[in-house]
Structures are given as C-alpha cells and as structure tokens.
Amino acid sequence: MCIRDRVYHTYLLIPSSGYRTQVCAGWLSLLVNAGEGIDVDIFFDRQPKDKVQQKLGQQLRINRSKIKDTSDTNSDYDDLDSAIRSGYFLKDGLANNEDFYYMNILITVTADSLEELEWRTNEMKKLLLSQDMEAVTCHFREEQAMLSALPLVSLERKLFARSKRNVLTTSVASCYPFTSFEMCDDNGILLGVNKHNNSLIIVDIFNSRVYKLSLIHI
C-alpha cells in the first residue's frame, strides 16, 4: 500500500497459532526495538469471567471425552492433550482471581521504496521466526489493517478473529514493553529521576522513530 508522499506501508498480523506457549518478562522488547519503520499496535480485550469459565468447562469435558476414544499413536492425541493441559492452566488461573483477555498484535512496516519495504517485511518475519513466532501479511485486508492501526482503539472484526490469543493477567503483565534501565533522549522532556540509579528520565515523546509502540488497548 502506497500512501501520500510515496511512503509504502504493509501490515503484519501474528495469528492465533503464531505465539510461543511460554514467554519471559519483557518479551515484546523484540518488537519495540525492531528499528526504524516498524510500529507495533497491541490490543487487550478483557472477557467476562463467568462466561469464560462456563465455556472453558464445556470445552474441557468435550476434549476429555475425545481423548478417551483416541489412540496415543494418533496424530490428534498430542493436540488434544495439549488443549486439555492449556485448559486446566486457564482454569487454575481464573480460580486464582486472574482475568481472561484476548490479545492481538498488529505490526506496521513502512519504507520509502517498495524494495526496502519488502526487505523490512522479510526481515521482520525472520526475526519472529527465530523466536518461534509467526507473522502473516494482511493480504486483501490492507485497508482494514490501516484503519485498525489508527488511534481509534478498534481492531477490525475479522482481523481480531484471526489473531486473538487468550492470555491471563500475569501474561498481560509480561507484555510491558519498556524494559530499558535508562531512558535519556537528547531533545526530550525531563519527567523525573530513576529511583534505582538516580539517572534522569528525559523522553522525547514526539520522536516516533524511537518509540515504536503506538497503542495499547485494554
């Protein structure tokens, strides 16, 4: 997609199956610090706990019934076993007063030329693949992705369905993107003092080339 002033855009979506099962704190720093031309939009949509618990219980009973009739040498056995273990993990988390969210990640890639855009897109996919993650291009959904990337706090319905990933409160906390020990920009605004090392916190909030995270919706 080419938008005014010959700036080329493309949009990547992390599908529901494209996330790692386990992540460490600050894992989104990989995307936030990806470099120039990479912007990240993260959406969190909290779901009603009572409805989630009811639906989760039903799905667990269905999966337990299916696995009884499946041989342990069948290729479906591992998928069912993983689904059951994930279901109990979510059930235990909800019982411990955690909330249930759907998370979506939309990545905007921009460049001054089509060749550079293709290179950045491929490098971004390789970067995620090296971390056992996957990103897909929003083919034929570029307009919807562009509107979703605007600061309107609204992810298009089909993009949401394709990329939603269930997470609990602790998993949401691990998505906090700012993990740098120091933060000091040359032309920034003094916000305060870092209590851990007494360094000044000076941030240029208008420099979009440095701070790539444009939207967090909870």
Task: Specify the residue positions occupied by each region the protein language model found.
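Extended, folded cores of ATP/NTP-driven motor/assembly subunits in large transport
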Residues: 4-178
